[in-house]
């Protein structure tokens, strides 16, 4: 995969430096501009799906004074708008229909802003599916790339002679945007799957609760009906007895 290409490139050119690995060390942490892509749903009725991811986003954004917000999903847009939080970009129709085309639009936007040094760090906050029953909000760092994430496991055993043409820099210029597109597409698909799973679980719970409520209401209705019938019979018998006594 692309990750293996990066690993091999760093293995054979350990002194290699590139703009996508720029940690912005010249800036103080409090002065850095941090970008957040927050992935929510377009609709509700999905249990705590939207609440959990928005809660994590707020917690992370509160840690920095300079933030840039990118929102995927109508729920996130409405939520931050109500709180008067500036939304720098919205990606419409993406939450319900994740495609490579839409992933490319997001990747190109944040990559360009990082290249131009408007953004110093970029994260995506979404819902990660653990299994069919469990999911949790997750924050994934996109930029800058970390060298240790691409360390080659066979650094001392790989003796191949590798040449990158036209240059290692040009290779990275081409590979990283494609890598980001694939990474973001994977995030969108996983978030969409988590949303559908959360909605199915919520609807299943609602159906169960509704069935139990109907059962309880039916029981109460039958009790009330039985009590009314008993009351009527009692009144009829009492009336008949009263007439007998009078006669």
Q: Residue ranges of each PLM-predicted region?
A:
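C-terminal beta-strand-loop-alpha-helix "lid" module of Rossmann-like NAD(P)-dependent dehydrogenases
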Residues: 1-247
């Amino acid at each position: 995969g692309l990750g293996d290409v990066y690993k091999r490139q760093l293995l054979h050119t350990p002194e290699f430096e590139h703009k996508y690995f720029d940690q912005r060390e010249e800036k103080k942490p409090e002065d850095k501009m941090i970008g957040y892509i927050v992935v929510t749903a377009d609709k509700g009725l999905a249990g705590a799906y939207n609440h959990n991811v928005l809660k994590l986003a707020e917690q992370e954004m509160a840690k920095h004074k300079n933030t840039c917000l990118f929102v995927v999903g109508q729920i996130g847009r409405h939520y931050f708008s109500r709180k008067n939080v500036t939304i720098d970009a919205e990606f419409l129709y993406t939450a319900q229909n994740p495609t490579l085309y839409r992933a490319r639009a997001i990747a190109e936007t944040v990559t360009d802003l990082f290249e131009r040094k408007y953004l110093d760090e970029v994260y995506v906050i979404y819902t990660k599916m653990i299994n069919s029953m469990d999911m949790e909000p997750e924050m994934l760092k996109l930029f800058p790339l970390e060298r240790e994430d691409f360390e080659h496991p066979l650094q001392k055993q790989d003796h191949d002679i590798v040449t990158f043409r036209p240059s290692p820099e040009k290779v990275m210029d081409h590979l990283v945007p494609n890598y980001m597109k694939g990474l973001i597409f994977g995030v969108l698909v996983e978030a969409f799957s988590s949303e559908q799973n959360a909605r199915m679980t919520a609807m299943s719970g609602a159906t169960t609760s509704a069935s139990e409520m109907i059962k309880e209401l039916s029981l109460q209705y039958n009790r009330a009906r039985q009590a009314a019938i008993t009351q009527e019979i009692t009144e009829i018998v009492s009336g008949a007895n009263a007439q007998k006594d009078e006669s």
